[in-house]
Regions:
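Short sequence/structural segments immediately N-terminal
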Residues: 1-280
């Protein structure tokens, strides 16, 4: 009996077969029933119970934060260059960096929507994560062991079982071929993890918003990868360029994609362009 023969995971297996990971075995990413110790064994036992009692469906199954971190560690085994780039950049920020930033906390108190971009897979509420009594300098993480956890893992922007047909396994591609696959706008390798739904939405299914500079419409890139970036690097509710966290390119750079200038994993510049973003 294999994973693919069990009807509960048929849809996931079909996606896997047509994905860039089709040459990777299920156990290489998910482990075995025993690899997660007692916790993993209890989970698999629960799945067997659900199978026979019909009390759980495919849609009810999702990864908790511990499992997401474990999968991200396994991503790094093959995606070593991407892991190194991520570790060197801002997207590897931790819970401590985000939620213990006193200066930022004085301007805006941490609340539930922070998890939309920072800590998407956190299992609890902001009050489970932090003690918010007193002044900003008194606020702290309730569990100190969570301080160095990454606030944005691989699965924040990537869907493992994403339908992205490949004519060559990713691990067999050279650096140039990998770069092409990462910036492919026809079948992007990115997806937005929606915390509220506990599901991924492929980047090419996201809405291409309209941005404004005063009364003028500013063209937004046609690259779905840029639409994903805009979910967190977002403008105010009037969609004004340079407002809030918006980084929409303007002027000579209008219509360019984030990936035209930035490494997708480190977020660092890969060219000499400057003054691309207008800041309000």
């Amino acid at each position: 009996l294999t994973c693919a023969q069990c009807h509960e995971v048929t849809s996931a297996c079909q996606l896997w077969k047509s994905s860039a990971h089709s040459d990777v075995r299920c156990v290489d990413c998910h482990g075995t029933a025993l690899s997660g110790g007692i916790k993993g064994l209890a989970e698999k036992t629960g799945m067997i119970y659900s199978h026979f009692t019909k009390k759980q469906t495919n849609e009810d199954v999702s990864l908790n934060e511990e499992q997401v971190l474990a999968v991200a560690d396994r991503c790094a085994v093959c995606h070593q260059a991407e892991q190194a780039a991520w570790e060197s950049g801002a997207h590897s920020t931790t819970y401590k960096d985000i939620f213990m930033d006193v200066e930022h906390n004085r301007m805006e108190k941490p609340y539930w929507d922070c998890f939309r971009c920072h800590g998407m897979h956190y299992d609890g509420t902001i009050h489970d994560l932090m003690s918010l009594e007193g002044k900003a300098e008194d606020w702290h993480l309730k569990n100190a062991s969570q301080a160095d956890r990454p606030a944005m893992t691989c699965l924040a922007c990537h869907q493992v079982h994403a339908e992205q047909p490949q004519n060559k396994p990713y691990v067999a591609k050279n650096e140039k071929e990998r770069a092409v696959s990462l910036t492919d706008t026809r079948s992007p390798a990115t997806a937005l993890y929606m915390r509220s739904e506990k599901l991924h939405l492929p980047s090419d299914k996201l809405y291409q918003t309209t941005m404004f500079d005063k009364d003028s419409v500013v063209k937004v890139s046609d690259d779905p990868n840029a639409w994903l970036c805009m979910q967190c690097h977002a403008p105010n509710n009037r969609r004004e360029v340079g407002s809030e966290d918006d980084k929409t390119p303007t002027g000579l750079y209008e219509g360019m994609s984030c990936l035209d200038c930035h490494n997708p994993h480190s977020n660092q510049l890969k060219n000499n362009y400057r003054n691309v973003h207008l800041k309000k």
